[in-house]
């Protein structure tokens, strides 16, 4: 449930109004004036809360819930205890999220931690920087020469924006984030402690005089509506740019190497490592801790399971996993085959009196 100390409490709302807002149906219309004051999980909800149920894994929690009302699909409607008002929705979780986005709009993107509504007197801003009206700069942030920042953007405490960086409108740059050599679009959310635009890992290795550093003269381009999780690092390109496509959502602690191109509306879970010069298509989903070798192409719509190591190109809409990654059907068949070999060998050893 939402904590009042961190987020605003929503106004009390009747079940009739909630059902209408969620495009759902209140099964017992006589309970339309029942008041709900917040949203909560089944096992934490009280009589004033709305919960949701859409997975039999939580059937025990549904049976024991003290919630005042529950969003539920027609399939599971009969499982709701009699004391809980049933709000029928074809997709309960989507309906729940729709309500949450309305009731807790302040939780959708970070606000100023210090209640700033302008530029803090403790910020350092180069005179040549151009900030549109409505930019918020928190204490101890540093903004370099010739930086441009659009209206509605918040620059968090201790963030550093290097020379000539351009940041669009309605963005959020988290506290202690460092940005250089980057062009950033509108409505980009960058969580705290990210590093964007530092030089990539480019060397000529093991020469006569050791490792020779290769100049990294490209940029980082981040398109509109991208979200970047805390602690993520994105290296600038060596010659061509590192590009993050529109609408892509990146989790915490992801490393993106130089010259990587990521398409639109991709999903990257935590602790992924992408080596340099990768090309990733649109609508690609990568599970947590995936590692991908350099100079590969991952086709549109591909999916890779968590903790996989990718050393080959993946075709469009491919479903791959494992180490090294391969099509999931092949991977599963190999796992079954290995388990069968181990089982058969164990049985043979027992028959022969071996441990």
UniProtKB/Swiss-Prot annotation:
Superkingdom assignment: Bacteria
Name the UniProt record assigns to this protein: UDP-3-O-acylglucosamine N-acyltransferase
Entries under PROSITE patterns matching the protein: HEXAPEP_TRANSFERASES
Active site: 258 (proton acceptor)
Xref: Gene3D superfamilies: Hexapeptide repeat proteins, MurE/MurF, N-terminal domain
Keyword terms: Acyltransferase, Lipid A biosynthesis, Lipid biosynthesis, Lipid metabolism, Repeat, Transferase
Function: Catalyzes the N-acylation of UDP-3-O-acylglucosamine using 3-hydroxyacyl-ACP as the acyl donor. Is involved in the biosynthesis of lipid A, a phosphorylated glycolipid that anchors the lipopolysaccharide to the outer membrane of the cell.
EC number(s) reported in the record: 2.3.1.191
């Amino acid at each position: 449930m939402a904590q009042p100390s961190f987020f605003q409490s929503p106004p009390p709302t009747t079940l009739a109004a909630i059902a209408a807002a969620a495009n759902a149906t209140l099964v017992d219309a006589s309970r339309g004036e029942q008041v709900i004051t917040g949203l909560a999980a089944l096992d934490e909800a009280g009589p004033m809360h709305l919960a949701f149920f859409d997975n039999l894994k939580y059937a025990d929690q549904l049976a024991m819930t003290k919630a005042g009302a529950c969003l539920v699909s027609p399939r599971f409607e009969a499982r709701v205890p009699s004391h809980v008002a049933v709000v029928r929705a074809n997709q309960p979780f989507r309906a729940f999220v729709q309500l949450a986005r309305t009731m807790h709009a302040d939780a959708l993107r970070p606000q100023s931690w210090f209640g700033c509504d302008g530029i803090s007197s403790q910020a350092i801003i180069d005179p040549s920087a151009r900030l549109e009206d409505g930019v918020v700069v928190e204490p101890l942030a540093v903004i370099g020469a010739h930086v441009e920042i659009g209206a509605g953007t918040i620059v968090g405490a201790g963030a550093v924006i290097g020379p000539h960086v351009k940041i669009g409108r309605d963005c959020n740059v988290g506290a202690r984030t460092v940005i250089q050599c980057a062009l950033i679009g509108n409505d980009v959310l960058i969580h705290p402690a990210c590093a964007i635009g530092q030089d990539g890992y480019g060397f000529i290795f093991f020469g006569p005089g050791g490792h020779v550093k290769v100049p990294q003269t490209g940029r980082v381009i981040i398109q509109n509506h991208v979200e970047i999780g805390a602690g993520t690092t994105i290296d600038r390109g060596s010659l061509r740019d590192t590009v993050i496509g529109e609408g892509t959502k990146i989790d915490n602690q992801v490393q993106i190497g130089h010259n990587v191109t990521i398409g639109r509306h991709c999903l990257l879970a935590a602790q992924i490592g992408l080596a340099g010069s990768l090309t990733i298509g649109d609508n690609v989903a990568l599970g947590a801790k995936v590692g991908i070798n350099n100079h590969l192409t991952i086709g549109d719509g591909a999916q890779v399971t968590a903790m996989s190591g990718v050393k080959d190109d993946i075709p469009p809409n491919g479903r791959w996993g494992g180490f090294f990654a391969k099509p999931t059907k092949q991977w599963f068949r190999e796992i079954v085959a290995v388990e069968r070999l181990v089982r058969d060998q164990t049985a043979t050893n027992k028959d022969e009196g071996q441990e």
